[in-house]
Amino acid sequence: VNSDVWDIGNIARETARAKTIDFTSPYVLIDAHFMVRKNSELRELKDVDSVGTTIAVVERSAYDLWLTENLNQATLVRAKSMEEAGSLFGNDQVSILAGLKPALLGQVANNSDYTILYPRFTAIEQAVGIRKGNPQALVFLDELIKELVSNGFIESSLKAHNVHKKLSIPSDQ
């Protein structure tokens, strides 16, 4: 939007982006979790934000922004990609890998020594975004998204594409 490359898009809703983009209500949530080794002493979310805990995170991701705003003691180690963050974790350079549930499920499927901490630490809200300043378009799109969520279309689409276990539907609409 800022570069005038696109007018409308499916994008994660978050505070920094909301300065230049208007968002609809979310239509899907992508849960963000922490992954640890099964032998880790870190077993619950409350254990994560502690001195000496290192967390690999993809820089500038929506969950990186959330972690930056919400963690006080743990150290974030930023990587340029999920592959790089996964390597930091796999090579024992960090104690935790933060990521979106779909990617972490793939990691756990490939390594029985890894486990995901539940519940999620945050959810990335996927929404439709448009350039600020078009309230009529925003109202139309927001009503459309709310209808697609409430009438079950979004849920049916997730099931049809076999991603319903990786994503969730917002329940507050």
Language-model features, listed with the residues they occupy:
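A ligand-binding cleft/hinge motif common to bilobed small-molecule-binding domains
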Residues: 11-20, 69, 90-122
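Acidic, polar ligand-binding/catalytic clefts
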Residues: 1-49, 115-120
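Periplasmic-binding protein-like
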Residues: 28-39, 101, 105-146, 164-173
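Short helix-initiation/N-cap motifs at beta->coil->alpha
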Residues: 42-43, 77-88, 124
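Hydrophobic residues within well-ordered alpha-helices
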Residues: 1-2, 48, 88-90, 128, ...
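Short loop->beta-strand "edge-of-pocket" segments that line small-molecule binding or catalytic clefts
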Residues: 46-61, 75-76
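Ligand-binding clefts/hinges and TM-proximal coupling segments of bilobed small-molecule sensing domains
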Residues: 62-79, 116-117, 146-173
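Beta->alpha turn/N-cap motifs
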Residues: 4-16, 38, 59-61, 81-82, ...
